Amino acid sequence: MAAPQLFRALVSAQWVAEALKSPRASQPLKLLDASWYLPKLGRDARREFEERHIPGAAFFDIDRCSDHTSPYDHMLPSATHFADYAGSLGVSAATHVVIYDGSDQGLYSAPRVWWMFRAFGHHSVSLLDGGFRYWLSQNLPISSGKSPSEPAEFCAQLDPSFIKTHEDILENLDARRFQVVDARAAGRFQGTQPEPRDGIEPGHIPGSVNIPFTEFLTSEGLEKSPEEIQRLFQEKKVDLSKPLVATCGSGVTACHVVLGAFLCGKPDVPVYDGSWVEWYMRAQPEHVISQGRGKTL
């Protein structure tokens, strides 16, 4: 079951390099650099893109393509906003979109944009396995500059099954209708290491399971095999035959859980879009599980 999905979800650096040499008019290829970093890292993703990127790529700004009326970071935008933004980058209904980022891990933020395209009904979307890090390690071509795109017409319609809300997670504390997997680092989940955002304490949602997103990746930054990922879920006592929801700090690395499940033949994992930032800000103190100080009124 995983083999045909693997091709759609992940494409290799060599595949992309060959596709750029031999473009197909029937299904144009569009590369998007979806690099995004936590502010405290001090990295400027757009500037890094302009310094070097895969030829023909456009920069996808996760913060720009988000709901600016929300108090929480980069929540999903409206379908109209997403359609306008994707179209401005040259994406049409016929486009095969391939997404990557420039993180040191291989892939970090790109799975968020892969998930966004699928949530808005565009399933011809893949991730560059290993990201820009692996592309560079293979000495493949790079370009520099702003790389303007020819605008295209793109339509989007949100599939609500891709998202869970705060209310859904709160109700599930008692109902236990779905499992919750948190992709943050273990210390943040346990409450022993600080959150990277001011005013947010570490900890986790009651009953959630921790699988740090880096556990889905090899030391080279490539995605682990479906068999290895299945074992990872099994070791964490996550049952892929039952409903599952992904969360993290702000909805970015949660999409690694979605991708991992997808590669194992489970394409129906939604994301709690507000994730830990929203949960912490809205939760009662007893709903913040932490080995640290947790939350007090």
Curated annotation (Swiss-Prot):
Compartments, as annotated in UniProt: Cytoplasm; Mitochondrion; Synapse, Synaptosome
GO cellular component: cytoplasm; mitochondrion; neuron projection; synapse
N6-acetyllysine: modified positions: 40
N6-succinyllysine PTM positions: 40, 146, 164
Tissues expressing this chain: Expressed in liver, heart, kidney and brain. Localizes to tubular epithelium in the kidney, pericentral hepatocytes in the liver, cardiac cells in the heart and neuroglial cells in the brain. Also expressed in vascular endothelium of the thoracic aorta. Weak expression in lung and thymus.
GO biological process entries: hydrogen sulfide biosynthetic process; kidney development; liver development; spinal cord development; transsulfuration
Region (Hinge): 145-160
SMART domains per the UniProt record, alphabetical: RHOD
Activity regulation, short description: By oxidative stress, and thioredoxin. Under oxidative stress conditions, the catalytic cysteine site is converted to a sulfenate which inhibits the MPST enzyme activity. Reduced thioredoxin cleaves an intersubunit disulfide bond to turn on the redox switch and reactivate the enzyme. Inhibited by different oxidants, hydrogen peroxide and tetrathionate.
Rhodanese domain segment(s): 25-144, 174-288
Positions where Phosphoserine occurs in the chain: 35
Top-level taxon of origin: Eukaryota
Post-translational modification remark: The N-terminus is blocked.
Catalytic-site annotation from UniProt: 248
EC number per UniProt: 2.8.1.2
Name of one Pfam family that matches: Rhodanese
Domain notes: Contains two rhodanese domains with different primary structures but with near identical secondary structure conformations suggesting a common evolutionary origin. Only the C-terminal rhodanese domain contains the catalytic cysteine residue.
Record-linked PANTHER family: 3-MERCAPTOPYRUVATE SULFURTRANSFERASE, THIOSULFATE SULFERTANSFERASE
Name of the molecule in the record: 3-mercaptopyruvate sulfurtransferase
